[in-house]
């Protein structure tokens, strides 16, 4: 741990005499810098350019060394706009990689790729910084136990359980509830696991980043009155920023998460939205650095770059980083190198369905499309596995019968199929759940449902014990006892109406 060489002026001033170069060439966000012989900076070192442009505006640009070209030249990628830079300007080598603030003081704040706060709430109250380029934990440090990461969300825990220290792909279009699901997970990990979350907005729209921040303040995930009680740190590198910033913002968020895992020994949730933009930014940088493109025009180092990020996301004996990554699939082509490389690292997929959202079933997680490598009898146990498989079979049969129902109606089905449809509709509604973060909008209190309660509830529905209850009794409730209580209330209400 050291003082941040980027933001701590005393460090920069001592380096001024030591290692100084000059800009030789500017190619958009890429700079060539000449250094004195024998004083070449290392790969990934941070370089700083300070000065004034032609109209007297202050310039403060940080770059990262990417290539050593020979003849005392290095090629660096800028982390902010290069407007106003000129050939011949002085460049200071900080002698260290980019470092960002870490620790509890980062919670409730918004940072850029350099770890500078951008929320107008003043400086961050910490002197502890970590470099963003770090090795993945050694094999000896890894926790090899396969354990489920309980989220308290029924549909996730039962049908596509998350692995502690695993990586989950989140697939869903606009307006199907991705943000609300993310916020509920942040809320639940804080309450149930005493953990914290880090959100990395990689190549996001600025509006989306702002909306997320506002919604987090409304729902209490970020506590405005006491910022230290917030449950999440936000790191943004928006669409309008240079590719260097978008390529490195994921590492900045991951570095903050690593501190909570390794030093505070906590369980951490790391959100990356969107992992495709990380690949896209790497592709832009690769082209600017003059590398030959590979398949479909992507960078030849695609697998290496993805691996260097993903391998740091893991469980150690101290704590865990469980990562949930939104995955954009270009032109819905799952064989595209970007999503295909991502899939190789995922332990589970959570697919959000527009059809379920249209029915008002939230969270709109598709029970048939969502998958998990953890759903095996030797990991989750025979009871959990058996229940999940029966829920999927019932839902699948209902899906197959929907066309027949639409054309001929329910009456034309066999007695057995009618029973299957009735139970499937109850299951579909019971997979919905009121969220804590949606309380302010819906007025109904949120529910955290333990895994044992979830399994018990679905076993009751599948056994046929609750066939006599109306299906609306299962909509937006927590455990099965609430559903039976709701059924009694509905019955009393209908009697009063008569």
From Swiss-Prot:
Gene, per the UniProt record: atpB
UniProt organism field: Phalaenopsis aphrodite subsp. formosana (Moth orchid)
EC number(s) on file: 7.1.2.2
Subcellular localization(s) per the UniProt record: Plastid, Chloroplast thylakoid membrane
Protein's UniProt keywords contain Zinc: no
Reaction(s) this enzyme catalyzes, per UniProt: ATP + H2O + 4 H(+)(in) = ADP + phosphate + 5 H(+)(out)
GO biological process: proton motive force-driven mitochondrial ATP synthesis
Entries under Gene3D superfamilies matching the protein: 2.40.10.170, Bovine Mitochondrial F1-atpase, Atp Synthase Beta Chain, Chain D, domain 3 (1.10.1140.10), P-loop containing nucleotide triphosphate hydrolases (3.40.50.300)
Lineage: Eukaryota, Viridiplantae, Streptophyta, Embryophyta, Tracheophyta
Binding site for ATP: 172-179
One GO cellular component, as annotated: proton-transporting ATP synthase complex
Record membrane topology: Peripheral membrane protein
Protein function: Produces ATP from ADP in the presence of a proton gradient across the membrane. The catalytic sites are hosted primarily by the beta subunits.
Chief site of localization: plastid
Protein name: ATP synthase subunit beta, chloroplastic
Pfam name, any one: ATP-synt_ab
């Amino acid at each position: 741990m050291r003082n941040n060489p980027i933001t701590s002026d005393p460090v920069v001033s001592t380096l001024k005499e030591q290692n100084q170069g000059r800009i030789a060439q500017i190619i958009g966000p890429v700079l060539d810098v000449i250094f004195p012989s024998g004083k070449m900076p290392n790969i990934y070192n941070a370089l700083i350019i300070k000065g004034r442009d032609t109209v007297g505006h202050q310039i403060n640009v940080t770059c990262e060394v990417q290539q050593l070209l020979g003849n005392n030249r290095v090629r660096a990628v800028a982390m902010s706009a290069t407007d106003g830079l000129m050939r011949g300007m002085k460049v200071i080598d900080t002698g260290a990689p980019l470092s960002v603030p870490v620790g509890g003081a980062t919670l409730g704040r918004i940072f850029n790729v350099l770890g500078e706060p951008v929320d107008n709430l003043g400086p961050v109250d910490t002197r502890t910084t970590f470099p963003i380029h770090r090795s993945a934990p050694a094999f000896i440090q890894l926790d090899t136990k396969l354990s489920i990461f309980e989220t308290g969300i029924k549909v996730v825990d039962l049908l596509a359980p998350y692995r502690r220290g695993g990586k989950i792909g989140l697939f869903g279009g606009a307006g199907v509830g991705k943000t609300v699901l993310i916020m509920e997970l942040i809320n639940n990990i804080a309450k149930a696991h005493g953990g914290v979350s880090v959100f990395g907005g990689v190549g996001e729209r600025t509006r989306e980043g702002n909306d997320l921040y506002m919604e987090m303040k409304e729902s209490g995930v970020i506590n405005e009155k006491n910022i230290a009680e917030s449950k999440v740190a936000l790191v943004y590198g928006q669409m309008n920023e240079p590719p260097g910033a978008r390529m490195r913002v994921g590492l900045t968020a991951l570095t903050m998460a690593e501190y909570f895992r390794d030093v505070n020994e906590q369980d951490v949730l790391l959100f990356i939205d969107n992992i495709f933009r990380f690949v896209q930014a790497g592709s832009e940088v690769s082209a600017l650095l003059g590398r030959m493109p590979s398949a479909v025009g992507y960078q030849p180092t695609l697998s290496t770059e993805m691996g260097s990020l993903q391998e740091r996301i893991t469980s150690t004996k101290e704590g865990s980083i469980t990562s949930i990554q939104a995955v954009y699939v270009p032109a819905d082509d799952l064989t595209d190198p970007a999503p295909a490389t991502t899939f190789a690292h995922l332990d589970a997929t959570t697919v959000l369905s527009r059809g379920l959202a249209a029915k008002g079933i939230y969270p709109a997680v598709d029970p048939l499309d969502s998958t998990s490598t953890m759903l095996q009898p030797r990991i989750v146990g025979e009871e959990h596995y058996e229940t999940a498989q029966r829920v999927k079979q019932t839902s699948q049969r209902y899906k197959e019968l929907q066309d027949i129902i639409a054309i001929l109606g329910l009456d034309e089905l066999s007695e057995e199929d009618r029973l299957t449809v009735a139970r499937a509709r109850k299951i579909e509604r019971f997979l919905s759940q009121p969220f804590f973060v949606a309380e302010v909008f819906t007025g109904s209190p949120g529910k955290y449902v333990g895994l044992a309660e979830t399994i018990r509830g679905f076993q009751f529905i599948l056994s046929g014990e609750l066939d006599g209850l109306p299906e609306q009794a299962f909509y937006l409730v927590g455990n099965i006892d609430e559903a039976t209580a709701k059924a009694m209330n509905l019955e009393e209400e209908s009697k009063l109406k008569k």
